[in-house]
Amino acid sequence: MSGRGKGGKGLGKGARKRHRKVLRDNIQGITKPAIRRLARRGGVKRISGLIYEETRGVRKIFLENVIRDAVTYTEHARRKTVTAMDVVYALKRQGRTLYGFGG
């Protein structure tokens, strides 16, 4: 580990910081037509106008919970990369078993 400074095992070698695009209001990324398509797939015929913001809020809370659990699994394993299995285990913990991603 000589000559690496704070880098550790070669992860993030301390090169210059890249400028990251500031992501503001990303919750709007799921569009009104996308929500409508999901509802149609679920058998919904008519949709109230208030549903769209409510759906975005519920989706945000759901993803926060899944990501929090997945990151907890990652940190417990002393890794820096969240794997598909971390997400599978996080979903299983919440009672939403997902098949097809290993394990």
From Swiss-Prot:
Keywords: Acetylation, Chromosome, DNA-binding, Methylation, Nucleosome core, Nucleus. GO terms for cellular component: nucleosome; nucleus. The modification N-acetylserine is found at residue 2. Signal peptide: none annotated. The modification N6-acetyllysine is found at residues 6, 9, 13, 17, 21. Core component of nucleosome. Nucleosomes wrap and compact DNA into chromatin, limiting DNA accessibility to the cellular machineries which require DNA as a template. Histones thereby play a central role in transcription regulation, DNA repair, DNA replication and chromosomal stability. DNA accessibility is regulated via a complex set of post-translational modifications of histones, also called histone code, and nucleosome remodeling. Belongs to the histone H4 family. This is Histone H4.3. It comes from Zea mays (Maize). The gene is H4.
